[in-house]
Amino acid sequence: MAAAAAAAAALGVRLRDCCSRGAVLLLFFSLSPRPPAAAAWLLGLRPEDTAGGRVSLEGGTLRAAEGTSFLLRVYFQPGPPVPAAPVPAPSLAPGENGTGDWAPRLVFIEEPPGAGGAAPSAVPTRPPGPQRCREQSDWASDVEVLGPLRPGGVAGSALVQVRVRELRKGEAERGGAGGGGKLFSLCAWDGRAWHHHGAAGGFLLRVRPRLYGPGGDLLPPAWLRALGALLLLALSALFSGLRLSLLSLDPVELRVLRNSGSAAEQEQARRVQAVRGRGTHLLCTLLLGQAGANAALAGWLYASLPPGVGDPGEDSGEAGVHFPWLPALVCTGAVFLGAEICPYSVCSRHGLAIASHSVCLTRLLMAAAFPVCYPLGRLLDWALRQEISTFYTREKLLETLRAADPYSDLVKEELNIIQGALELRTKVVEEVLTPLGDCFMLRSDAVLDFATVSEILRSGYTRIPVYEGDQRHNIVDILFVKDLAFVDPDDCTPLLTVTRFYNRPLHCVFNDTRLDTVLEEFKKGKSHLAIVQRVNNEGEGDPFYEVMGIVTLEDIIEEIIKSEILDETDLYTDNRKKQRVPHRERRRHDFSLFKLSDSEIRVKISPQLLLATHRFMATEVEPFKSLYLSEKILLRLLKHPNVIQELKFDERNKKAPEHYLYQRNRPVDYFVLLLQGKVEVEVGKEGLRFENGAFTYYGVPAIMTSACSDNDVRKVGSLAGSSVFLNRSPSRCSGLNRSESPNRERSDFGGSNTQLYSSSNNLYTPDYSVHILSDVQFVKITRQQYQNALTACHMDSSPQSPDMEAFTDGDSTKAPTTRGTPQTPKDDPVLTLLSNRTSLPCSRSDGLRSPGEVVYLRMEEMAFPQEEMPNFEEHRSQQVSLSPVAVPTTAASDPECCNIHLDPEASPCSSDSEENMGKKLLRTLSGRKRKKSADGERASEENSNLTPLIT
């Protein structure tokens, strides 16, 4: 029977060796001498599962690792029937305490060390087995049998759940050093008595510590296993980082860095370039090292981490959950995070520095792997020929520059120039030429007179094609503007004479010529202008050359710099898209009337700005409209000195008084129109602020404040030693209604309904402040200047006036001798100086002047040109002397207008004069020719009821 037992044990070993990690099916029958009939029910046992290799049956002994839970199948022989009445038993034995528990039960008790096969003398003396089985204190706490026996599905077998607890630290070390762990024997309760099954029957359980691997081999401590895994992972990361940092550096890039990088980059590139030159050998070395490190890490983790994991609860009664793929999962995650992601994140940003500092280590690794990697590298070089480097074509280089734009220090203009230079070879002349219809050209039969030369100079071109006949396609010559240096326009030299003398060669290119070729031709100095032509083979006739346009050096430079070069003569920003230059038109205006001289104006403004100012005031500002002031007088007023002024803004003293054009509650007597700059307006007591810019105006009521009197006779002035007096008119204002008064409301003149006027001098008091925010240029017209302009305008529009003769010869002064006779106002031939068309009514809001106030017209300050008098041959030595004309005004009790007449007794005039004084004065100042008034006969009657106002 012993031979049979040994054979069965050998069979179990072979099954374990052949079916690793599989369930060991072993039926172990005790072949020892037959026990008494009461214990014959337990025949043998076997593990139902191996718990991932942690449970096995070796040499007749059941082996399990600590912390394992497994199912145990037991085989038994059914015993006699259970008695009906319980039999008294010791108090500590289950089933014998009077409870009637006759169910079979299994427990484990710990055996002393060496009991598994040591000599009897070496085993410590203990009580017999059955006696120990009865003592509950001797039952093993490290091995528990969970629950009662359950039916095993086969007659004569049952299943029971066994759990092996974790051994304590000292017990694990003693068990490991003593021969493979702690030993436990089995105690069985058959319902009547306890029976001990030990080594004799093969019912032993040996618990081994976890320091043993899945195959039972001894493993190092946990800290040593973790350290080994970290070292292998670091080695894999090292090979991965070297591969990324070294192989990502292209030889071309290293050469560029060595020649154009910084000092540190040049040194690093020099050190790496020697190793990177043997690319295939380096590649094989690094890949071999990384593959070996990854494989070693996987094997180490498989040996260190148990493949079976699980610890079901006490009442679950199921085997542990098995994860044989756990080492592979841990190895994959560690390699992915530690050996791929981290090295790539670092080496992709600092690859050159890492590669240069690890050159010595790389050389050592290449030398270690030389026997394997060098032949393989040579084989790859022979099979794949030369190593493929990163070479950029023109298109790839352009895209690289565009992609690197956010990270490079290239500005947009530099990038455009590089792009234009690289695209120069891909463009042809036809894409950049100027069509023939847009070219400025001259006929060959033209004459270089003043008009032609002026047109050439106004065009702004320096090279002008010359065509023959009526066909602009027939270009026969080129005219350079510098060829006209010795040409006098008064000589009317034929253009053909100049072109034949210089004989400039024509440079013709075809429409499909590349721009780089044309640029090379221009660089040779032949010409900077080429005629673009193409072969026209359309139709049935013979092919011929057709001129499409011209191309210049400027066109090619514009394509290189990717921008348009505009000069003062360009009308279009792009010859192809026909986009006009802003604020530049082809139409030419003659602004000679607005060309100013130094004596006329102190602040320099352009004629265009003067024209715009004149048009704006004449159409938008009520007091300066043609209804009240003629455009000619307005222009002379704008040319008057000190009318257009400039004011500089001081950043350091922003609140200086000189920075205010108007201050709230401070009287003023001038009007301001802003031409350039910005101002800030503060309105009312609330201090509301807003900004205004060019062509905003203020203070219109300041120049419109006036008063008149119809009771007093006022002295107008003297001309050539004679006085001119103004008489009152009994008639009242009837020409304009109050709704037509230029001093209306704030909406018309920028004033306010709450604005005040000084009672003493009728000055306008604004309720707002105007403060400049930058350098400004503005028009400033005082009330006196405006009144002078009104007087001149009224005198210009007066139909009749007494004539005068106030011109002297030499140094003598000749007083006038002819006077008129006084007449009544109704029959008086003396007419008013103002007409109904140019009269200005009074307003109650304007305020009235004091009786003693005198208004000086100061016509000598108006810059009027002198003209030749009608009898210039007789009076060429006489001059016109203008003196201030005093117009005293008096206050009126109501807002009535005054009618001002000339006193015939006080006015020096000729009895047979056909021209009034106002006409002659205005004609003398403005340069107009003498013209008789068609309405002279009806002037007195028509103006008898008009009461215009001069203030």
Curated annotation (Swiss-Prot):
It is found in: Cell membrane. GO terms for biological process: magnesium ion homeostasis; monoatomic ion transport. Predominantly expressed in brain and testis, and, at lower levels, in kidney. In the brain, expressed in hippocampal neurons (at protein level). PROSITE patterns: CBS (PS51371), CNNM (PS51846). GO terms for cellular component: dendrite; neuronal cell body; plasma membrane. Its main location: membrane. It comes from the Eukaryota. The modification Phosphoserine is found at S850. Pfam families: CBS, CNNM, Ig_CNNM4_N. The modification Phosphothreonine is found at T821, T824. Residues 433-495, 502-568 form the CBS domain. Residues 218-414 form the CNNM transmembrane domain. It is a multi-pass membrane protein. InterPro entries: ACDP (IPR045095), CBS_dom (IPR000644), CBS_dom_sf (IPR046342), CNNM (IPR002550), Ion_transp-like_CBS (IPR044751). Residues 731-740, 814-824, 942-951 have a biased composition (Polar residues). Keywords: CBS domain, Cell membrane, Ion transport, Membrane, Phosphoprotein, Repeat, Transmembrane, Transmembrane helix, Transport. The chain crosses the membrane at residues 23-43, 222-242, 282-302, 319-339. Residues 920-932 have a biased composition (Basic residues). Residues 114-138, 731-754, 795-830, 903-951 are annotated as: Disordered. Probable metal transporter. Shares weak sequence similarity with the cyclin family, explaining its name. However, it has no cyclin-like function in vivo. Belongs to the ACDP family. This is Metal transporter CNNM1. It comes from Mus musculus. The lineage of its organism: Eukaryota, Metazoa, Chordata, Craniata, Vertebrata.
